[in-house]
Amino acid sequence: CLLIIVPFLYTELSMSKKILGSIIVILIIAVGFYYQSQLSDDDGVKKVGFIYVGPVTDFGWTYEHDQGRKAVVEAFGDAVETTYVESVSEGPDAERAITQMARDHDLIFTTSFGYMNPTIKVAEKFKKVKFEHATGYQRADNVATYAARFYEGRHLIGLIAGGMTQSNTIGYIASFPIPEVIRGINAAYLAATSVNPTVEFKIVWVYTWFDPGKEADAAKALIDQGADIIMQHTGSAAAMTTAEE
């Protein structure tokens, strides 16, 4: 079992990093467009802020966003100044953090789906500040959204999983039942069944983006249910660590 789980999980991490790497490109382009649009207004340093749902050391979603922030600094040099706040929970804490940042920033990236409503609410109060919200669907005159085709990577992972599984059971650790996550599950499942029509997916919802304890417990539960391959749509490496045990 472990011989199958561990290599696959590292394969998933590697492929996910390639997909998440597109975030770096998105951030650079977004800042570039913003900077060019503001050149006629003044030539001062633009302050760009980032609100993160997890720690920058999670080696996942937040880590890649912070790599994007660093790439922005490298690309634009002294023309921009960046700041970030990490581990901001979705809800009232997010609104407070975004509001505080909006008081002295020109462009703000709110990097989690659950920041959508707080972003829209704060944007109404700070019309001169531009906002970029990750994976959301609400927009305003000063709020744009960005995303990548993450489901394409999960489709490839599903193909691999469908061909590798020996127990015919694949476990999936899911965060929240929102379109982004459900789309990923569907992509992986459709791909897996295209090469192995009898494969079964078992899903555990953890209702968090980053909680190593819950993710580890979910992985253990899926392994106990016969899964020999584990996928995840969460932010920590806890599932991989559990699979190695």
PLM feature spans:
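A residue-level marker of the well-folded mature domains of exported/periplasmic proteins
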Residues: 20, 35-245
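Secretory targeting signatures
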Residues: 1-39
